[in-house]
Amino acid sequence: TGLTEGVIDVNTYLPCAGVYKKVTPNPKCWIYPSAHGNLNVSQGIQHSCNDFFYEVGYRLGLNSTGDSKLDNDTSDGKSTQNYYSSERGIAKLQKYAEEFGLGDTSGMEIPESDPQISDDNSVLSAIGQGTNNYTTSQLARYITAVANKGTVYNLSLLDKVTNPKGKTVKDYTPEVKNKVTDVSSTTWQAVHEGMR
């Protein structure tokens, strides 16, 4: 989301100090009391750095004036805090969550819980916290779409149904729900590099 929305690029390095101070209460990286230091997006994914993605969630919530003040911002956000809106960031996160199929059930043939895309706190939601609520099958469909560069499939537990003689009665071929088309090849490359 951050790469596609332009709040970071593949050459952007963001600091992890172990504690993120631009919002209160101050969320912590999983490595706290240590820190990861400066990371690019591939390294942020590789190390699963909370602080990196807290900052992405924060930047998603900035208006254009706030964006222009990032170069002079401090670790506590004094230069940008007046231009931050969690609702603005949440709207962007929700848009991409929907594109990747997280707003719907996975398509399996059994009952499953309805998903909940976070509607609260863009900073925490950027690392999957907030009010997100998904089943493992919904997350599996999402990560499959990330791995295959944007094809979202409806999941199936069945391959085929056969009669007693082994003849196929019904074939369950993979069904494409949608394709995510607004992600650049550079973004896919950076994400996949981080996931290796």
Residue ranges and their predicted role:
Residues G2-R196:
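Beta-lactam-recognizing serine transpeptidase/beta-lactamase-like catalytic domain environment
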